[in-house]
Amino acid sequence: MTRPIAGKLALAAGVAISIPFMAAAANAASSPAPIVIPDSALHAMSTTVGGAKPQPSTNTLTHFFRTAFNPLDSTTFGFNMVGQDPALRRSTTITVDVTPLNVNVGGATFNGTDILQPTLTSPVFTDNDYTSTQFVSDPAVANGHGPGGTLSPGNTSNQLEDATMRSQFNEQGTTYHLLHNPVLHPAITIDVPKPQGTLIQTARGVVAGDIDATWWSTRIQNLNNSLSYADPTHLQLYLTDNLMLFTMNNPLNCCIIGFHGASEVVGHGLGSTHGNGNQPIQTFAWASYVTPGFFNPQRAWTLQDIDPLSHEISEWADDPFINNFVQPWTSPAIAPACSNVMETGDPVVGVGFTKETNTFRQGPTPNGTQVADGFYHPEDEALLPWFMRLNPSPAQTAQSGTNGRYTFMGDLNPFLVFHAPPPGCPA
């Protein structure tokens, strides 16, 4: 049974405010029709923004530092993660400042306030039993998913990231926790000028806003430095509804659906501009709620509702300052490219599972395709032993019982590359 964490939901006083960063969106009557984008051009992506190197005295969120030895390249890597060292078996609660963004783009309005309730009642912020899951990704079948099974025994009443971190360090069933305390703030309205945004429509008739990634990331960083409630010990979380980002000045180079970042900040009593290299560090994330059917369900069934948010929260927890570097890796999600950053969601984009009932937007798409299935869709996440090429894996034992797992889903992940350490990247 799902329940909000008792006493952990607060509403900041105030009313919705508007920040006209640029010219107001065009009138709907004079707006061009959405650009129809084929499924072949829909590529779910995420990115990172900024990065910072905390010192022991830095004013920022609670985190710990560890090292891990990679036997494949004989290198010891250091990493920072949110919370306290799991070996201490302590509980850490991070305040999450939740700011919905109501966005006018291409003559249409996409209100982040519309998706607040389904987000706050999702597995990201509520306790669930992760012993099993109903369905999991299976790209070999037409609807993109198949039956689930045993998922993460021992995580019986946990928020999603808490369960993931406990599985990663084999601490399920212990007193180790990483929890989120969401605090709601007034909605902010952003008007996107025509050159920086438009509307796109997929083959199933779902319409989304499509915004230039550079322009959007600048708006988010401006908010980090201007909002009076910004606190470096909190996570600043910005939520939108059906907004995608494009790159290279081309709306068809789509679709970034979330990012997380870190940056040194000043103002609001947080320190002077002369911090001698030790200014407060603010971590932040943006994620879009995705209507079922925007992405092709066979290719990316799990890419709906909270999938982008689960991706960004997990990556923020495992790499809050964007400085956890590892031996280069690749996966089916990014091949033939390689990455040397420990971004836990990037290897498994498009792979996930179901958890908890979702009643929001469960009808067919505008062209009549029924994609929604009545559940939330968290993304799978690659774990530290996968990036470190550890064999055996010290994470929670996989369902087969022969080794520790390499992703949160373990043996339920349909790709064998995630059932063992990955090889090195081609030279």
Give the ranges of each region predicted by the language model:
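Bacterial N-terminal signal peptides that target proteins for export
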Residues: 1-11
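Extracellular structured ligand-interaction cores
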Residues: 232-234, 303-304, 313
